[in-house]
Amino acid sequence: MIRKLDDFDIKILDLLQHDATATMAELSEKTGLSANACWRRIRLLEADGVIKNRVTLLDPQKIGLGITVFVCIRCAEHSQDWLDNFLQIVNESPEVIEFYRLAGDIDYLLKLQVASISEYDRLYKKLVSRVKLTDVSAIFSMEELKHSTILPLPETSDKAERKA
């Protein structure tokens, strides 16, 4: 069972979401906890799966992957074997950076980051040759207006805010 997050956990998570490279000394100063207490809390949050990973976020434009494609997929097949095959192909494709099963008219949504339309087309051909799909529609992003990896966290009490 996962423990309930307290105000200090929330403050630490908020700080790390904004800067995962923050030192224990910086976290200590901003939370009012000792560096050792911050370290222990982070280890517990990692063990509980609250903190999944610490990564460096890259700018897709600056590494030559400036085209964002949302691929809407409809299918008639929904068996576990079919899904396992589909998942295998998606997992083999690093261009697919997000993958969702949906409720509604569209069954699956993929988000791709590619260098060119021809790169998207190569992935499209690979996908439709290996998985039975009813309809595949691509939506090409013209401009990213907002992108965030920061999740909204519950408000902390006044006590934690005064200490931070």
Swiss-Prot record:
Q: Does the keyword Cell wall biogenesis/degradation apply?
A: no
Biological function = Represses the secondary, H(+)-coupled glutamate uptake system (Gluemp) genes.
Q: Which domain of life is it from?
A: Bacteria
Which Gene Ontology terms describe the biological processes this protein takes part in? Answer: response to amino acid
Q: What name appears for this protein in its UniProt entry?
A: Glutamate uptake regulatory protein
**Would you indicate the residue range of the signal peptide?**
none
Q: List the disulfide bonds.
A: none
Task: Write down the DNA-binding region ranges.
Answer: 24-43
Short name of one Pfam family for this protein? HTH_24
The terms under GO molecular function for this entry are: sequence-specific DNA binding
Species of origin: Zymomonas mobilis subsp. mobilis (strain ATCC 31821 / ZM4 / CP4)
The UniProt keywords, alphabetically, are: DNA-binding, Repressor, Transcription, Transcription regulation
Annotated Gene Ontology cellular components are: cytosol
**Lineage of source species:** Bacteria, Pseudomonadati, Pseudomonadota, Alphaproteobacteria, Sphingomonadales
Report the residue ranges that make up the HTH asnC-type domain in this protein: 5-66
| PANTHER family registered for this protein in UniProt | DNA-BINDING TRANSCRIPTIONAL ACTIVATOR DECR, LEUCINE-RESPONSIVE REGULATORY PROTEIN
Entry-linked SMART domains: HTH_ASNC (SM00344)
